[in-house]
Amino acid sequence: MSTPQPPMPQAAVPDWQGGTAGSPYGGYTSPIPVVRTHLGHAIASEWTKIRSVRSTMWTLGVFLVLVVGIGLLVAALVEANASEGSLAGDNPLSFGVFGLLLGSICIITLGVLTTASEYGTGMIRTTMTACPSRSRVLAAKAIVFFAVAFSVTFVSVLLVALADVSILSGARSPSTQEWLKGTLGISLYVALLGLISLVLGSVIRHSAGAITIMIGLVLAPLVLALFMFTESLSGLRDALFNYSIPSQMSVFYTTSLTNDGPTGWDPLWIALGVTAAAFAGAVSLLQKRDV
């Protein structure tokens, strides 16, 4: 029979009871530095999420392949089949729109996944616990995603633009305004399109459903307009053509699909207004609904 060991003396409790002068109770002082959280912390958290998720790299990789690959392929085919002087009045930047039309689906998908995937996995509860301000969480997601989407799109379209100008030797030289619209303008527009997808993902809370809705919004107006043959539907047909997303994207390359509708920088202001309205609605819903 072994002799029981005497109890070990307890370690002294750290003196965290600093107390304030004149207070009858001691005040607790945390051994860990405590700082007031702000938007920068939420942005840092969302940046860690978006760059550590494997789907981000895959989606952006496919986007680069589509935009650059199709843009260069179209330019090469046009140059190979063009006769002398046939491209004299064409803007060489305009051939980059074909790859961007398909590539925008990747940005839409990534935008939806940035928010909706957290609802699918349940991680949104952890996110909201760490940052109880729901509007701050959505704002941080929007800022990080917009920065990523704009940067990748701008680099892609700039590479395609420079390559197409050198490949299409018979085309005219783009003006400064055309360079701005064909690189900066279209990049902002695609990033805003992805931002609308992000907001829709937070509203729908279902990845497949939100992606389907966004692809429908991109393609359905143009497809529906093609089947409106009657004269009574001519007004609706023209509106669908003029304000469809493919038509608005083509405006940045001065090759609009229609003679009417938005011109110049109008598509960018339209997208900005729709994004602001959608974001305000999403914040309102986020404040009222449980996660």
Where are these regions (language model features)?
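Membrane-interface helix starts
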Residues: 48-65
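Hydrophobic core positions of alpha-helical segments in small-molecule transporters
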Residues: 59-62, 139-140, 210-213, 270
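Transmembrane alpha-helical core residues of multi-pass small-molecule transporters
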Residues: 62-66, 144, 156, 160, ...
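Helix-loop-helix units of permease transmembrane domains in multi-pass membrane transporters
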Residues: 113-147, 151
